[in-house]
Amino acid sequence: MKFTFKSSFTILLTIFSIFLVFLLNEEGEIPILFNLLTFAGIYGLAAIGLNVHFGLTGLLNFGHAAFMGLGAYVTVLLIPHAAGREGVVVTTGLPFFLALLIGIISAALFGLLLGLPAIRLRGDYLAIVTIAAAEIFRLLVRDLESVTGGVYGIINFSSSLQQYRLGFIDNFASSNDLNPSQIWVAFLSWTSIILVLLLLRRLTNSPWGRALRAVREDEDAVRALGKNAVWLKLQSFMLGAGIAGLSGVLLAFNYGTIQVSTFVPILTFYVWAIMILGGVGSLTGPIFGSIIFWVIISETTGIAQLIF
C-alpha cells in the first residue's frame, strides 16, 4: 500500500473511530468492539468484491446484494437446516466447507450469467440491469417458500460451521464474556479478508490486472490492442461476485438465520458507501472504510436500531 496523504488520513480516521467506540461506551466496550469488528469484516469483504467490479474494472454494479444472497442461500440449503413457516427440518447435507465452495462458485456463475447479456452495457444501463436482477432474485427467494423458507427464512444451520470452531476462540470468548459463535465468524471474516487481499494483490500486479485497469480507463483502446474487453469484464464480474457470495455466507452465519429481508437494495448501498469511504480502487481501502462506516452506525442510535 502506498502511503499518500489520502491513505494516511483514512488510517488515522479509522484509528480515531475505534477510539471513539471506547470513549462513548462506558460499559461493555469489548463486546461492542467485537460486534463492530464482525460487521466491519463481513461488509469489508463485500466491499472488496464490489471494488473489483467498480474500482478495478469500472463496472457499475448496483445488485451486489443478490450475489451475497445467492452465496448464502446455496450454502445454507446444502447443509442441515430448518426452513419455512412449518420449520421443515433437513437433517442431511454436505460438509460445511464443500457447501461453502459450491455457494461461492454459484455466486460467481450467477455473475457470469448476468454478465453475458448485460456486460456490453455501459454506465447507467448496466446499473439498471443489476438493480433489476437483484430485485428479481429477492422476489424469487420470497416466493419459493418450499425451498428457501420465504419470508420466514431458514434457521438451525449454524452448527455446521461452529463444529469447526478452534479451541482458543472458546477460551478467549469465555474470558471476555463474549459470544464464541460471533467471535468465530469474526475470525473467519478477517482471515478471509487477508487471503482475498493476498490473491488480489497478486492478480492486480499481473498482466491480467493491468488489462482490467485499462478496460476501466479506455475500453475502446483495449479492443484496438486486440484484447477481448468483454471477456475481461466477465472475469472481473465473476471474481467480485464470488467474493460477495463468501461475505453473504458469513453474514448469514453471524445472524444465525437467513431471511429475504437481509438482502435488500439498501445492503448494496451500504457496501457502496464503505467502498467510497475507503477509497475506490484501493485494495485495502474497503477495510478502513468498513470500520469507519460501522463506527458511525453503532454510535448513531437511531440508525443502529434499523440494523441491529
Task: List each language-model region with its residue ranges.
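Central hydrophobic cores of alpha-helical transmembrane segments in multi-pass inner-membrane proteins
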Residues: A40-N51, A107-L112
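Short helix-perturbing small/polar motifs within transmembrane alpha-helices
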Residues: G111-I119
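Small-residue-mediated transmembrane helix hinge/kink sites in multi-pass secondary transporters
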Residues: N51, V76, G115-L116
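Short hydrophobic faces within alpha-helices
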Residues: N61, A221-V222
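Membrane-water interface segments at transmembrane-helix boundaries in multipass membrane proteins
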Residues: M1-I42, V74-I105, E135-E217, R223-V280, ...
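An amphipathic alpha-helix/helix-turn recognition signal
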Residues: A66, L113, R216-E217
